[in-house]
Amino acid sequence: MKAVIQRVKRASVKVNGELISQISKGLLILLGIGKNDEEEDIKILADKIVDLRIFSDENGKMNLNINDINGSALVVSQFTLFADCRRGKRPDFTNAADKEKALDYYKKFVEYLKSKIGDVKEGVFQAYMEVELINDGPVTIILDTEELKKPRRRKE
């Protein structure tokens, strides 16, 4: 699983011009599910996102997580995070999960995240969406469970 996490002042999703979801201060999470992802990746990724201290404390230091600020999350499915652009001029998406697996894992990710964060909103799976956001910082972090599962490197 891959996620692009953006700290936002606000974010919203529209489908066909109709407002579907919106949040104020919190995180916009663009979520990609790969064909080799496993169910354990859901918890690994969600727990990492919840625990990331990327919000500023009273001294301006990134020291608070999303729950510390009573923030919201907006989750938007995005299979294009698994684009392979090594060859040709058109991205190859064969590393993305098929739609059945992707929908299943997406729903499970959202439900698990709801158990960890008070306010979680969603986009519409497989829909063409207009995503609007006001970045805060900007702070943008890319997470990949393939990397998160590797052992930490030792400092030498």
Swiss-Prot record:
Intrachain disulfide bonds: none
Catalyzed reactions: glycyl-tRNA(Ala) + H2O = tRNA(Ala) + glycine + H(+); a D-aminoacyl-tRNA + H2O = a tRNA + a D-alpha-amino acid + H(+)
Recorded family membership: Belongs to the DTD family.
Major localization listed first in the record, in broad terms: cytoplasm
Cellular-component GO terms for this entry: cytoplasm
Motif placement: Gly-cisPro motif, important for rejection of L-amino acids: 137-138
Keyword entries, A-Z: Cytoplasm, Hydrolase, RNA-binding, tRNA-binding
Origin species: Dictyoglomus thermophilum (strain ATCC 35947 / DSM 3960 / H-6-12)
HAMAP family for the chain: Deacylase_Dtd (MF_00518)
Gene3D superfamilies registered for this protein in UniProt: D-tyrosyl-tRNA(Tyr) deacylase (3.50.80.10)
UniProt keyword annotation of Hydrolase present: yes
Name of the protein in its database record: D-aminoacyl-tRNA deacylase
Domain description: A Gly-cisPro motif from one monomer fits into the active site of the other monomer to allow specific chiral rejection of L-amino acids.
E.C. number(s) listed in UniProt: 3.1.1.96
Molecular-function GO terms, alphabetical: D-tyrosyl-tRNA(Tyr) deacylase activity; Gly-tRNA(Ala) deacylase activity; Ser(Gly)-tRNA(Ala) hydrolase activity; tRNA binding
Quaternary structure (record): Homodimer.
Cell location: Cytoplasm
UniProt cross-references to Pfam families, sorted A to Z: Tyr_Deacylase
InterPro entries in the record: Daa-tRNA_deacyls_DTD, DTD-like_sf
Annotated function: An aminoacyl-tRNA editing enzyme that deacylates mischarged D-aminoacyl-tRNAs. Also deacylates mischarged glycyl-tRNA(Ala), protecting cells against glycine mischarging by AlaRS. Acts via tRNA-based rather than protein-based catalysis; rejects L-amino acids rather than detecting D-amino acids in the active site. By recycling D-aminoacyl-tRNA to D-amino acids and free tRNA molecules, this enzyme counteracts the toxicity associated with the formation of D-aminoacyl-tRNA entities in vivo and helps enforce protein L-homochirality.
Domain of life where this protein originates: Bacteria
Gene Ontology biological process terms in this record: D-amino acid catabolic process
CDD domains, alphabetized: Dtyr_deacylase (cd00563)
